[in-house]
Every structure is written in C-alpha cells, then in structure tokens.
Amino acid sequence: MLKEGQKLPSFKLNNQKGDAVKLPAKDMTLIYFYPKADTPGCTKESCEFQSNLKKFNKFETTVFGISKDSVQRQSKFAEKYKLKFNLLSDESEKICEKFGVWVNKSMYGRTYKGIERSTFLVGKNGKILKIWRKVKV
C-alpha cells in the first residue's frame, strides 16, 4: 500500500482511446480511483472533477481517473459525460493493488473485492503529497 511521502512507482495503463499513458506525469498529478464507470457515485465524482478541470489546469495539475472498467466502457463514460481528462483501465487490478485500493467490501451480507474510492495527489517530483481514502460522494 502506498503512503504519503513515497515516490509513485511508474506504470502504464491504457486510456479511454486505447493509448498507453505513463505515470507519474511531469506535472502535479491527481489520480482518483472509482469503483465503476457510469454508476451514480462515480458519475457524480467524475463530473465534479470535470467541472473543476480549469482550476486544476491553472495549478498545472493533471487529472486521471482509474477503474477496473474496460477501455471501451471508459470511452463510453467519457463521451457520455464529456470528460476531458484521461480515464485509465486497470482490468488486471494490479495498479489498484499497488495503491492499496483493491479491498474487501461487503454489501447485503455478501463479501467481494472492489475499488475503495480514493484520491492521490502527486507532486512534480513524483512523491505522493496527499492521500484521501474512503472518499464519500
């Protein structure tokens, strides 16, 4: 599990266009993990990042969303809600596991693995500045 102050390990994931994106980026980076594209909470969260995108850009901060959804599902989600930032597909859950967001969850008495909604702010030096876990929307 990654912690504040640690250097972000480099990794590549495909975005909603199928292009490989390498992180960490050279700018400040905000990475948010969301459970599933086009569901109420994830849509609200993603649209909130989109509506604040100009503010992030002003501070030279690049926004990335990561979920287990396929590239195709990410593409439909981005298109439907006019999201102008990269949505990355981690179908293997490897990156989610590295970040410590692939966790045991339970609903209606059933236990399963899923993404814990979390956000990571990474500095230009590649170090994690702040982590918000168990984000509520």
Per-region residue spans from a language model:
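Chalcogenol-based redox active-site neighborhoods
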Residues: 1-137
